[in-house]
Amino acid sequence: MSNTTRVRKNESLEDALRRFKRSVSKSGTLQEYRKREHYEKPSVKRKKKSEAARKRKF
């Protein structure tokens, strides 16, 4: 999914950048990119999930 932000008439570049950052944050694009940046084996995912559950329990 691509995020497009067009600079409006009489809008500063800083304001347009702020709107773009907000839209990227809301859509979760950056989080998805960071998650997929490196491949994680399913066994490692399960191990991390169980570790997180164990930490929440205590």
From Swiss-Prot:
Keywords linked to the UniProt accession: Ribonucleoprotein, Ribosomal protein
Span list, region Disordered: 25-58
Keyword Cell membrane on entry: no
GO cellular component entries: ribonucleoprotein complex; ribosome
UniProt GO MF annotations: structural constituent of ribosome
Pfam families recorded: Ribosomal_S21 (PF01165)
Ribonucleoprotein in keyword set: yes
InterPro entries found in the cross-reference section: Ribosomal_bS21, Ribosomal_bS21_CS, Ribosomal_bS21_sf
PROSITE patterns: RIBOSOMAL_S21 (PS01181)
Listed Basic and acidic residues bias regions: 32-43
Biased composition (Basic residues): 44-58
Gene3D superfamilies in UniProt: Ribosomal protein S8 (1.20.5.1150)
Any single biological process term in GO: translation
Family to which this protein belongs: Belongs to the bacterial ribosomal protein bS21 family.
Stated name of the protein: Small ribosomal subunit protein bS21
Gene: rpsU
